[in-house]
């Protein structure tokens, strides 16, 4: 390849896998994806940040090596903190195992706050890591730590590419919540990337993109249709996605995400923690005079490093020794660990991964009511869905192993047992697959380096219905669970009160029929509507979900052209994974009741419209006697008063509504006959 051709086939946009324990950067260079080594010559970088005696930032292996000298200044697991609140139970539990000090912090006012955990707090990003050196205290937000890791990787890429890099695709877990996604984008901005040139990509989707690209690279004329499951088990998160791939040779390829599942607090760190706890327990048994509180943080960090090493050794060996000299004073820690013991310790977590995998299969078949046991270790499967689950499982062509923890032999064995050993593959280095796919995506979006003949398009999906509140508190969905993104949907609504000059647009997320059972994620007003009878104004509402999953809702009055909108991004009200599971369970349990409620409110609305139409007729009619007019207004007022006390489904019985509606229909029919109209006015 000529130098000129190589330059034209090189992109200055990069792909970054910002991992919990390790991160990786890749670029599209001279027509192919290349993993870029860091300043230490490593293909992956520990997601660790520390500070030296002069308070200078140290990143990666050098930071991790400072554990022995200054353990309290070595920060890891930032990915588990970003976008979360201090009171999050997962954060509170994790704090117990972190050697560094994590505090509640008001970043706006720059002050530490009491660490007392409060019920029902919704204040995101109120976490700081507190580092004290030489009598001086500094506070670092998790986003700053992630930003420092991203900057380190950005510098490595610029050294390889020979110039400034300001565009990137940064990967996030598929089940990251909106605050976590937004804070990740903020970290990229801190690292010096152009905020308008940063795209987020789900980690399993990036890995699938790597697989798709490799398939087309192997054979430019490759044509096939495959159902591919991506099993992505990293250091701190677990994602599983099912995609439909269609390879069309020189015409390019298409991958559509059909379903996702996962756990943003499940990964290799959790396996490490179980090993650590086991070793401490064994050590204390042998040294009964020592208490756990006597153990120093530096010793615990050395134990963590040793457990991480031995965990990797057990992927190829059947036993190993966990040895930490002078673990406490002159006492060494020396624990023999077999692969069988390790698998027994972690069995419930391995099973949890498999149950999530089955849940993903069910979601891909259009089953929204996927429910798990309280600890997440068991899929609560309706027996009637067993056949569906097996059908989807049997249609899987490949299971892609992604993430360092997917190398664990027991994980491979469970997947092989369930899907068939011949289907379980590792097409790219498991530690590099996500960065590989992100780099290809970055080159495709931000440059012309990728040849059209090798193009690959991947389309993601939304996890829950996105709705607005309509009359009676009904959730009217514009975008449905499973719809592929990006997506834009528009529907026309109207007012339901006479002379209404403003409307409030309430936006909800969830699969229930009534808004009160879903999650409110935004609200805004549209003012300046010209006063008119209800039903006359036309309000056009548009839902627009972009590639990053960011929702923009726009409302426009068609008569005046006035509009307003809301961007639903870093909202503290977006759903967590636990809330999604709770709501899908409730949706299944209450499906019949929801349908009955929706029908009930529909009947109420029809009755309300009938009264409104008849009232307008009576007020304008010239051929109706004063007696009939007076009687009509009395009946109208009586029913309007009843409706004013029947705003919610629980305020009235449907039988009473039907009786009143039938009586009103008979009354209006008689009136219309008297004036020679032959029937009730149209609602």
UniProtKB/Swiss-Prot annotation:
Superkingdom of the source species: Eukaryota
Primary location group: cytoplasm
GO cellular component entries: cytoplasm
PROSITE patterns: HSP70_1, HSP70_2, HSP70_3
SUPFAM superfamilies in the record: Actin-like ATPase domain (SSF53067), Heat shock protein 70kD (HSP70), peptide-binding domain (SSF100920)
Pfam families documented for this protein: HSP70
Molecular function as annotated in GO: ATP binding; ATP-dependent protein folding chaperone
Keywords for this protein: ATP-binding, Chaperone, Cytoplasm, Nucleotide-binding, Stress response
Bilayer-crossing regions: none
InterPro entries: ATPase_NBD (IPR043129), Heat_shock_70_CS (IPR018181), HSP70_C_sf (IPR029048), HSP70_peptide-bd_sf (IPR029047), Hsp_70_fam (IPR013126)
Subcellular location: Cytoplasm
Similarity section: Belongs to the heat shock protein 70 family.
UniProt-recorded name of the protein: Heat shock protein homolog ECU03_0520
Organism, scientific name: Encephalitozoon cuniculi (strain GB-M1) (Microsporidian parasite)
């Amino acid at each position: 390849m000529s130098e000129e051709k190589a330059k034209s086939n090189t992109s200055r946009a990069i792909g970054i896998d910002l991992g919990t324990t390790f991160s990786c950067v890749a670029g599209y260079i001279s027509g192919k994806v290349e993993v870029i080594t860091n300043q230490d010559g490593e293909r992956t970088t520990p997601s660790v940040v520390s500070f030296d005696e002069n308070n200078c930032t140290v990143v990666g292996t050098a930071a991790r090596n400072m554990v022995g000298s200054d353990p309290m200044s070595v920060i890891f697991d930032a990915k588990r903190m970003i976008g979360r609140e201090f009171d999050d139970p997962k954060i509170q539990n994790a704090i117990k195992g972190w050697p560094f000090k994590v505090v509640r912090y008001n970043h706006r006012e720059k002050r530490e706050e009491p660490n007392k955990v409060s019920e029902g707090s919704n204040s995101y990003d109120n976490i700081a890591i507190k580092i004290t050196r030489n009598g001086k205290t500094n506070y670092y937000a998790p986003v700053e730590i992630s930003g420092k890791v991203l900057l380190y990787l950005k510098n490595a890429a610029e050294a390889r590419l020979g110039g400034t890099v300001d565009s990137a695709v940064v990967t996030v877990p598929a089940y990251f919540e909106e605050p976590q996604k937004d804070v990740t984008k903020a970290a990229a901005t801190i690292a010096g990337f152009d905020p308008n040139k940063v795209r987020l990509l789900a980690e399993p989707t990036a890995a699938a993109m790597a697989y798709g690209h490799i398939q087309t690279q192997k054979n430019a004329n490759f044509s096939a249709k495959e159902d591919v499951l991506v099993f992505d088990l990293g250091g701190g998160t677990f994602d599983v996605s099912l995609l439909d791939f269609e390879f069309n040779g020189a015409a390019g390829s298409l991958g559509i995400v059909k379903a996702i599942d996962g756990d943003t607090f499940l990964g290799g760190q959790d396996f490490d923690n179980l090993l650590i706890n086991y070793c401490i327990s064994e050590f204390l048994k042998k040294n009964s005079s020592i208490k756990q509180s006597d153990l120093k943080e530096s010793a615990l960090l050395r134990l963590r490093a040793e457990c991480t090493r031995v965990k990797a050794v057990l992927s190829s060996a059947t036993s190993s020794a966990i040895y930490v000299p002078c673990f406490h004073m002159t006492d060494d820690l020396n624990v023999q660990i077999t692969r069988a013991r390790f698998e027994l310790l972690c069995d419930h977590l391995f099973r949890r991964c498999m149950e999530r995998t089955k849940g993903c299969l069910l979601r891909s078949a259009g089953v929204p009511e996927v429910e798990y046991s309280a600890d997440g270790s068991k899929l609560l499967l309706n027996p009637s869905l067993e056949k569906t689950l097996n059908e989807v499982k049997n249609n899987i062509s490949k299971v892609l192993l992604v993430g360092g923890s997917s190398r664990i032999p027991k994980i491979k064995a469970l997947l092989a047992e369930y899907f068939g050993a011949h289907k379980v593959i590792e097409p790219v280095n498991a530690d590099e697959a996500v960065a590989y796919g992100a780099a290809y995506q970055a080159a495709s979006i931000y440059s012309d380096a990728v040849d059209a003949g090798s193009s690959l398009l991947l389309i993601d999906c939304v996890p829950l219905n996105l709705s607005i509140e309509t009359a009676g508190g009904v959730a009217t969905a514009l975008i449905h669970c499973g719809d592929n993104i990006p997506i834009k949907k528009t529907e026309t609504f109207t007012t339901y009160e006479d002379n209404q000059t403003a409307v409030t647009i309430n936006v909800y997320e969830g699969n229930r029929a009534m808004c009160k059972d879903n999650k409110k994620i935004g609200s805004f007003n549209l003012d300046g509507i010209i006063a008119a009878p209800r039903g006359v104004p036309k309000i056009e509402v548009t839902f627009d979900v972009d590639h990053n999953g960011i929702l923009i809702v726009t409302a426009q009055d068609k008569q005046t052209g006035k509009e307003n909108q809301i961007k639903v991004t870093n909202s503290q009200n977006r759903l967590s994974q636990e809330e999604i599971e709770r709501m899908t369970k409730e949706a299944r349990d209450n499906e019949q009741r929801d349908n009955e409620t929706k029908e009930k409110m529909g009947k109420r609305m029809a009755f309300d419209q009938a009264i409104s139409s008849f009232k307008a007729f009576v007020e304008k009619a010239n051929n109706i006697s004063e007696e009939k007019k007076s009687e009509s207004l009395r009946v109208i007022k009586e029913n309007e008063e009843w409706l004013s006390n029947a705003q919610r489904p629980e305020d009235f019985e449907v039988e009473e509504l039907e009786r009143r509606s039938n009586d009103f229909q008979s009354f209006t029919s008689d009136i219309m006959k008297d004036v020679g109209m032959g029937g009730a006015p149209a609602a």
